[in-house]
A protein has these predicted regions:
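Short helix-initiation/N-cap motifs at beta->coil->alpha
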Residues: 58, 95-107, 122, 244, ...
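Ligand/substrate-recognition segments at binding pockets and active sites
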Residues: 70-72, 215, 219, 223-294
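Alpha-helical secondary-structure segments
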Residues: 11-17, 21, 61-62, 91-93, ...
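Extracytoplasmic/peripheral linker and loop segments enriched in polar/acidic and small residues
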Residues: 1-2, 6-7, 172-173, 207-212, ...
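Ligand-binding "clamshell"
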Residues: 125-136, 284, 298-310
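Gly/Pro-rich hinge or "lid" segments in bacterial periplasmic/extracellular proteins
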Residues: 3, 18, 22-24, 29-89, ...
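Structural transition elements
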Residues: 182-224, 245-247
């Protein structure tokens, strides 16, 4: 513990000594995505069931879970009276409904069963003039993960061909229509600024050439890759989640790839998110359509994913 530079000054005070400056340290300490204080006795008493139900889950924020089951389609939260700022919390609770069909979600919203829904595709056009409609960036990136242990995907030219042969602008404007923006990079605009007030994107540059949309260049890379592999065709399975938006993007990618890369066949595998994650973590997939969101306001929340062994 001494080597870690942490000290319990009293029952409610933690003192941390840093080896180097960290501008976002306070944020990290308060972010549930990074550090969570847990009662050791409680965690040990739950054994392997910790955090699998409302009774085996602790909370130190404004709300606590009152109803939750891993397979349930609803999660219910109630106000946490032990929260230090409980007097400032105006809601008695929050209820989350898991609805994969956006049309069903919109109908529930119109019926008064939901207060907030996320829209994509044609539903955006239906509601964009509605005063209740608003758009905001959440910093999430959708991206493709090729399994480089699979034959064909272990070839860099094949991977580059896949990356350059689909139109990101069309995905955002014709498929999603939800305010998403095309990116040829991974750290999004608006995440973090430096000491000069410059956005990270301004300071770091805007794109990686190997990701930019260029069908002719993609075809040349594809031809080169097939030659290196000694093949004239390849077949891959694209794995995606069972939400409307994920399936729509996957279908668009399937069409783009098959139209732009001669000899390529793409099959779609649609799974619930939990199953998709399990298969991808085990390496049982070809190409995965997945996403990542920032845990804190610093480029490293995105960049440290690409360090070997991370």
């Amino acid at each position: 513990v001494e080597e870690l530079g942490v000290e319990a000054a009293d029952d409610k005070t933690l003192v941390v000594t840093l080896s180097s400056p960290c501008a976002i340290f306070d944020y990290l300490m308060a972010s549930g995505a990074c550090f969570l204080p847990l009662n050791q006795k409680f965690v040990e008493s739950c054994g392997g069931n910790f955090a699998t139900s409302a009774d085996t889950l602790l909370a130190d924020g404004p709300f606590k879970v009152s109803s939750y089951e891993p397979s349930a389609m609803k999660v219910e939260l109630v106000k946490n009276d032990q929260f230090f700022g409980a007097s400032d919390v105006k809601l008695d609770g929050v209820e989350f409904s898991i609805i994969t069909d956006s049309q069903t979600a919109a109908l529930s919203f119109e019926n008064g069963d939901l207060d907030v829904v996320t829209l994509s595709g044609n539903l955006v056009e239906q509601y964009e003039d509605d005063p209740r409609f608003s758009t905001r960036s959440d910093g999430y990136n959708w991206y493709l993960t090729p399994n480089m242990k699979k034959e064909g995907l272990d070839n860099v030219n094949i991977r580059k061909a896949l990356a350059k042969s689909y139109d990101k602008e069309a995905i955002t404007t014709r498929v999603l229509k939800d305010g998403s923006t095309p990116m040829d990079y991974f750290v999004p605009q608006g995440l973090a600024t430096n000491e000069k007030g410059e956005d990270f994107r301004e300071a770091a540059g805007s794109a990686y050439d190997s990701w930019t949309y260029d069908v002719e260049a993609a075809k040349e890379l594809w031809k080169t890759g097939l030659g290196e592999l000694g093949k004239d065709s390849l077949s891959f399975t694209l794995m995606c989640e069972d939400t409307d938006s994920a399936q729509a993007v996957a279908q668009f990618l399937q069409s783009e790839w098959q139209n732009n890369l001669p000899g390529l066949t793409i099959e779609l595998q649609v799974l619930p998110k939990k199953a998709r994650l399990e298969y991808m973590q085990k390496g049982e997939y070809d190409i995965g359509l997945t996403r990542w969101g920032p845990d804190y306001a610093d480029p490293m929340t995105d960049l440290d994913m690409w360090i070997t062994g991370s």
